[in-house]
């Protein structure tokens, strides 16, 4: 059976490809924005964090939006075909960076300003306990216990390391002094043995040499007597 896709006209296939590429560009741009939004840490001072995000979007790796840098490139939203989007030219990349920066600034700055204003006007609003269910309260309680247990464990491990260090210093201090004295005593003992052996060998060599000369003379005299008797 013939492939139904083979009946499509070439211009129709080109239009479909261009439409697919355009949609993939939109998906990729949205994914980049969402990834950067997820990295935001809206803490006590979110303005600095938002400025950091805007800076990353402006001069970060998004400048190469659409470029292929290897087979291990992340797929767009898990779509295998998401990595086949066409590369963007310089104008497109600049437009994307400008629009991303403008959209982030327009969307996030009012949120940050509102958050700062709420914190100033209602400083105790965020400290009040939320209306949580029993299960949620239990989860929070267990999380607090877990965090408290970890803090206690860290404190105990730190205390243990300190005690081990102090014990090692107390133990090794006198021990090293005693070992040094022992090494000195052993060295003196070896030196004394060497001196005794040297004196013994000198004495033995001198005494044995004297006896050897005397015995040699006696044997020589005895041989002379035997030779004279044979004549």
Swiss-Prot record:
GO cellular component terms, A-Z: cytoplasm; HAUS complex; meiotic spindle; microtubule; protein-containing complex; spindle; spindle pole
Keyword Cell division belongs to the record: yes
Hey, what tissues is this thing expressed in? In adult females, detected only in the abdomen with no expression in the head or thorax (at protein level).
Q: Where are the transmembrane segments?
A: none
Q: Does the keyword Cell division apply?
A: yes
Q: Name one GO molecular function term.
A: microtubule binding
Coiled-coil annotated residue ranges, if any: 128-199
Q: Which UniProt keywords apply?
A: Cell cycle, Cell division, Coiled coil, Cytoplasm, Cytoskeleton, Microtubule, Mitosis
Q: Which superkingdom, per the lineage?
A: Eukaryota
What is the annotated localization of this protein? Cytoplasm, Cytoskeleton, Spindle; Cytoplasm, Cytoskeleton, Spindle pole
Q: What is this protein called?
A: Augmin complex subunit dgt2
**Protein source organism:** Drosophila melanogaster
